[in-house]
Curated annotation (Swiss-Prot):
<feature type="active site" description="Proton acceptor">
    <location>
        <position position="286"/>
    </location>
</feature>
<dbReference type="InterPro" id="IPR046348">
    <property type="entry name" value="SIS_dom_sf"/>
</dbReference>
<feature type="active site" description="Proton acceptor">
    <location>
        <position position="192"/>
    </location>
</feature>
<comment type="similarity">
    <text>Belongs to the PGI/PMI family.</text>
</comment>
<dbReference type="GO" id="GO:1901135">
    <property type="term" value="P:carbohydrate derivative metabolic process"/>
</dbReference>
<dbReference type="GO" id="GO:0005975">
    <property type="term" value="P:carbohydrate metabolic process"/>
</dbReference>
<dbReference type="GO" id="GO:0097367">
    <property type="term" value="F:carbohydrate derivative binding"/>
</dbReference>
<comment type="function">
    <text>Involved in the synthesis of UDP-N-acetylgalactosamine (UDP-GalNAc). Catalyzes the conversion of glucosamine-6-phosphate (GlcN-6-P) to galactosamine-6-phosphate (GalN-6-P).</text>
</comment>
<protein>
    <recommendedName>
        <fullName>D-glucosamine-6-phosphate 4-epimerase</fullName>
        <ecNumber>5.1.3.42</ecNumber>
    </recommendedName>
</protein>
<keyword id="KW-0413">Isomerase</keyword>
<dbReference type="Pfam" id="PF10432">
    <property type="entry name" value="bact-PGI_C"/>
</dbReference>
<feature type="domain" description="SIS">
    <location>
        <begin position="12"/>
        <end position="143"/>
    </location>
</feature>
<dbReference type="GO" id="GO:0004347">
    <property type="term" value="F:glucose-6-phosphate isomerase activity"/>
</dbReference>
<dbReference type="GO" id="GO:0004476">
    <property type="term" value="F:mannose-6-phosphate isomerase activity"/>
</dbReference>
<dbReference type="InterPro" id="IPR019490">
    <property type="entry name" value="Glu6P/Mann6P_isomerase_C"/>
</dbReference>
<feature type="active site" description="Proton donor">
    <location>
        <position position="208"/>
    </location>
</feature>
Amino acid sequence: MDEIYLNWDKMFDEAFRIPIHEIKNDNIVFSGIGGSGIVGEIANILGVELSFKRKFTGKESLIAVSYSGTTSETINDVENAVKAGSEVIIITSGGILEKLAKEKSLKLIKIPSGFQTRYAFPYLFTPLIKMTTKRRGIKINEMELKEGVIEAKEQIKADATRLAELLINRIPVIYSSKYLAIAKRFKQEINENAKHPAFYGEIPEINHNEIESYVHGPSLVSVIVESSEIDKITEDVLNSIVIKPYFNSDEKNISSLLALAGVTSLEMAKKLNEKPDKLYNIPKARQLTSNLFKIN
């Protein structure tokens, strides 16, 4: 299964060809949850300034991302934005959101279906970053997203094996400053693929509180996704495992480090004899949330 992440370069190739829409407003609000939601936080690494305050006045553009098209929280945001008269752009592979887009003549970006959401990052992220950087007037080299996976592929395999050995049967807490969203994604991948506890936190905030928890937290293991000089303070204090970015380019680091997170979590799943695609608790939570929002 490691190949799912290591073949992201091919998925990026396909994603580059997905048609996008123009964003009308400067106030860009993002809605998404889980594997669909993290793409907005990662996009902000590249300076696109997405807002996550989902109160709609009609003067903003909502970009709603749900791979399945059935995420209750995102559907609710779309309905509220439509009522307010906001511009709505939907990125999805189908489901209720595709139906809503067609019924209400909303802007729709249809992406390939048939994957677990967390495996489909290139399809979710590429249209989002192309639209938002264009609106913000930010120049990025989108081909570097593909190149990051290709150029780091062998190192990713080796590092994932090493990390899985270090993290298994401990509780990893993944920290970063600039790359906080990547740390969060590491945590999510370990949770969902390996069914293993993991948490994340933001540097420098944790240097003022959380680092004291290691006094009585022998099962915790600190992991730093290094992104600035201040990260090294936490590394020194907690004797952390360090994940060093492979490149100087944010675009290459985003794709390669997220691929590393995915492959590491799959290696942990193997050691725990877990099936990455099997879900124990999430389906029940989804159904209860759907009931709460009265989504059919």
